[in-house]
Amino acid sequence: MEGGLRSPLNRAVRMAKYLLDSCIGMLPYPKQRCESFNVVDLLSTCSFYKAVSLKNLKLHIEQHPSFANPSLSHISKFAFTELPFHAFTFSIPKMSLDKQESPIPIVSNDKNIGIFESQNSSPNLSSHESTLDGNNMHTVSSEGSGAYAEHGPGIDHKIPQELEIQSKPDLLWSRVRHTMREPFSEFFGVFILILFGDGVVAQVVLSSGERGSYQSISWGWGIGVMLGVYASGVSGAHINPAVTFANCIFRKFPWRKFPIYMLAQVLGAMCASGVVYANYKSAIDMFEGGNNIRTVGLNTSSAGIFCTYPAPFMTKTGQFFSEFVASTILMFCIYALQDNGNLGSGNLTPLGLFFVIFGIGACFGWETGYAINLARDFGPRLMSYFLGYGHEVWSAGNYYFWVPMVAPFIGCLFGGWLYDVFIFTGESPINTPWMGLKRLMPGGLGSKKVDSKV
C-alpha cells in the first residue's frame, strides 16, 4: 500500500511545488499583498492532503501580533490584506508515509543563515535547511554560519533578501561589470584622484599663482583623495598600489587581485592626466611659449603638472627618505582610521584621509612633491612622455623617476608594520607566533615540536 502510493504521491508533491512556486512567482515581492491564500485547499487539490497530517502542517507567521500563535482550527482560511509576503513562513517537516524529507521548500527568516545560491534544492535537507527567496531561487542554509552573498558576510535579514542578493546577471555587459567592477572601481577612484590633483597643480602653475597657491595644491589633492575613496568603495578604495600591497601582507587581501588592481590604478592615472592635458592644452602652449613646446626642468616647464620632480638641492638619499617618511605616515594613518578597536572613523574615513593628505602636503611636500603613490606618479609620467615631453621625464633629477615607484612600497609596509606591532590587536601576521615569520618558514624554526624523549 505504502509503495503503491509513493509514485502518485511524488507526482502530487511535484505538482504542489509547481503551483506554490507559481503563486509565489506572481507576487511582485515584497510590496504586493496576497489577498487570500488557502494552503490546505491547495494541498487537497494536489491529491496528497491525506498523506500529510494537519498536525504536521505548521504555519509560522513572524512580526505580526494578530498571527503570532495561529490556531490549527483556523489554519485553512486566512487573509494577508495587512501582511507583507516576506513576513510569513510555512513548513512541512516530514512525510509520514515514505519517511522521506519533504521536497517542498521551507521559507525561513532566521537571522543567522548562510546563503549560497543554487538552482536546485537538495533532496536530503532537514527542516529549516532549504529556503525559498523572493525570486523562487532555492537556497541552502547552514544554521549558525555567517550570511554570505556577493560581497561576503553581513546580510541583514531584516531587509528583504531580494534587495540584498542579486541574481546572476543575464546581459553580457552586466556579466562583465559583475566580474570587473572592482578593477573598474579602482580605475575610477584613481581617475578622480588625478583629475583633481593634477587639475589644481595645472591651475596654480599655469596662472603663475594668480589662481591659487601651494596650499591650494594641498587642498586639491586632499579633495581628490576623499572623492576618489568615495568613488571606489566597492573595491576597498585602495587607489594606491602600495596600499594594496600592504593590505596583502597585513590584512589578507588576495594576492591574485594585486596585479589587476595595480594595472587599473595606473591606467586610471594615465587617462585622468590625459584629460587634464586636453583641458589645459591652450594654457600650456601659452605658458611654454609656443604651440607644442614641451620642456622639463625649466622655470617655464609644465611637466611638473603631471608628475613629481625633486627640488634641485635634494640628494638621492634625501629624495628616497622624503618619500619613505610620507608613505609611512600615510599607511599608519590609514590603518588607524580603519581600526574599530581604536577610535576608528567609520563612514568618516574619506574625510579623515582628506586631512591626512592635506597634512602630508602641507608639511612634507616641498622637497619631492609627495607622490607616495606609484600610480599617481608613474601613470601621468608615462602619459607626459607620450604627449611630447621627451626622455627628460625619466632622466630629470638624476633619474628620480624610480624613487616614487619604490619608496611608497617600503614606506607603506613600514607604516603598516608599526601600527600592527604597537597598536593593532586584531587579525594580522604580526599577532601570530614569530610575528608571522613562522608562516614563511615551513619546516623551519618553531614549526615542529621537539620530542622531549629524544
Curated annotation (Swiss-Prot):
Span(s) of short sequence motif NPA 1: 240-242
PROSITE patterns referenced in this protein's UniProt entry, alphabetically: MIP
Glycan attachment residues as annotated in the record: N299
Catalytic activity, as annotated: H2O(in) = H2O(out); glycerol(in) = glycerol(out)
PANTHER family attached to this UniProt entry: AQUAPORIN OR AQUAGLYCEROPORIN RELATED, AQUAPORIN-9
Compartmental location: Membrane
Induction data: Expression is higher in vegetative hyphae than in conidia and infection structures.
GO cellular component: plasma membrane
TM ranges: 187-207, 217-237, 258-278, 317-337, 352-372, 404-424
Primary location class: membrane
Keywords: Glycoprotein, Membrane, Repeat, Transmembrane, Transmembrane helix, Transport
Gene name of the encoded protein: AQP9
Protein function: Water channel required to facilitate the transport of water across membranes. May play a role in the vegetative growth and pathogenicity.
Name of this chain's protein: Aquaglyceroporin-9
Record organism: Botryotinia fuckeliana (strain B05.10)
Ranges of the Cytoplasmic topological domain: 1-186, 238-257, 338-351, 425-454
Sequence ranges on the Extracellular membrane side: 208-216, 279-316, 373-403
Domain of life: Eukaryota
Pfam families according to UniProt: MIP (PF00230)
Signal peptide (from-to): none
Note on domains (UniProt): Aquaporins contain two tandem repeats each containing three membrane-spanning domains and a pore-forming loop with the signature motif Asn-Pro-Ala (NPA). AQP9 has NPA/NLA motifs which is in accordance with the fungal aquaporins (NPx and NxA).
